Amino acid sequence: MAPIKIGINGFGRIGRLVARVILQREDCELVAVNDPFITTEYMTYMFKYDSVHGQWKHHDIKVKDEKTLLFGEKAVTVFGNRNPEEIPWGGTGADYVVESTGVFTDKDKAAAHLKGGAKKVIISAPSKDAPMFVVGVNEHEYKPELDIVSNASCTTNCLAPLAKVINDRFGIVEGLMTTVHSITATQKTVDGPSMKDWRGGRAASFNIIPSSTGAAKAVGKVLPSLNGKLTGMSFRVPTVDVSVVDLTVRIEKPATYEQVKAAIKEESEGKLKGILGYTEDDVVSTDFVGDNRSSIFDAKAGIALNDNFIKLVSWYDNEWGYSTRVVDLIAHIHKTCQ
């Protein structure tokens, strides 16, 4: 079968890591990248060297000319257009476009890519109006007529598989989530202006910063039976990658913590293998850098108050795990449309 041809709009943290994922897969081909803010030469540097995930060592990357990068012998077309409708994706053969600028996250804005010849757009962020899919949870509900979809957020990708298992096995009455989340590119290195979120403008490397997140509520969109039952918040902490979800839930069907652990372990080795992980090791956050699973349940970190009230802890590489799911979702969409 011919590889799935993919273009990337926005060569930031997620854009570059999605590119790394694509280039390591046999079933996918990176054909084009658009970013108006960096040159091809700088693109090669940013792709090759990564402070978190290390140096790219799979094949040489070099500039062929202003409009072309070479990954080994593979040519990738480079554009520098600010307006999505002006990017000629069709000319490169890119059927799927990963929208990873963080700017064009609603359906109307993301639809501009279709004008340039793309057939499907996958938004690598939550969307207010595009249907959201979480691989392992609701991707089977994708219909071929949907041209613009969202891969939800990294936190929703961690929380949803765990919540699905607990809800399917024991029933969730209600719950609260906290994510202890690594810093991201939108934060400030030193105190600076942030009109919409005053706390978010404080120095990222020096503070624990309470923040809002729609990740828990978004679970209700991918699992309608949980709509209105979960909400949550975030603490931004001074680590550069890997985050952890703390999910505290009241369950309908009484169960010991051992029974809950056993259910999660069983699912992690079955239907959710590769998506949901399970560990009983004494792990810390850096142990999950580069982990491509969406959610790794930490059996030793959780606790139960009684047989109906439990706290569950699950790790995720909010960069690499999420980027892997973006490409998995594209592969699923492609298969569904055949």
Swiss-Prot record:
NAD(+) binds at R13, I14, D35, R82, N318. The record marks H181 as: Activates thiol group during catalysis. GO terms for cellular component: cytosol. Keywords: Cytoplasm, Glycolysis, NAD, Oxidoreductase. It is an enzyme of class 1 (oxidoreductase). The keyword Cytoplasm applies. It catalyses: D-glyceraldehyde 3-phosphate + phosphate + NAD(+) = (2R)-3-phospho-glyceroyl phosphate + NADH + H(+). It comes from the Eukaryota. PROSITE patterns: GAPDH. It is found in: Cytoplasm. The keyword Electron transport does not apply. GO terms for biological process: glucose metabolic process; glycolytic process. GO terms for molecular function: glyceraldehyde-3-phosphate dehydrogenase (NAD+) (phosphorylating) activity; NAD binding; NADP binding. Pathway: Carbohydrate degradation; glycolysis; pyruvate from D-glyceraldehyde 3-phosphate: step 1/5. It holds the Pfam family Gp_dh_N. The active site is at C154. Belongs to the glyceraldehyde-3-phosphate dehydrogenase family. PANTHER family: GLYCERALDEHYDE 3-PHOSPHATE DEHYDROGENASE (PTHR10836), GLYCERALDEHYDE-3-PHOSPHATE DEHYDROGENASE GAPC1, CYTOSOLIC-RELATED (PTHR10836:SF112). Plants contain two types of GAPDH: cytosolic forms which participate in glycolysis and chloroplast forms which participate in photosynthesis. All the forms are encoded by distinct genes. Homotetramer. Key enzyme in glycolysis that catalyzes the first step of the pathway by converting D-glyceraldehyde 3-phosphate (G3P) into 3-phospho-D-glyceroyl phosphate. Essential for the maintenance of cellular ATP levels and carbohydrate metabolism. This is Glyceraldehyde-3-phosphate dehydrogenase, cytosolic. It comes from Dianthus caryophyllus (Carnation).
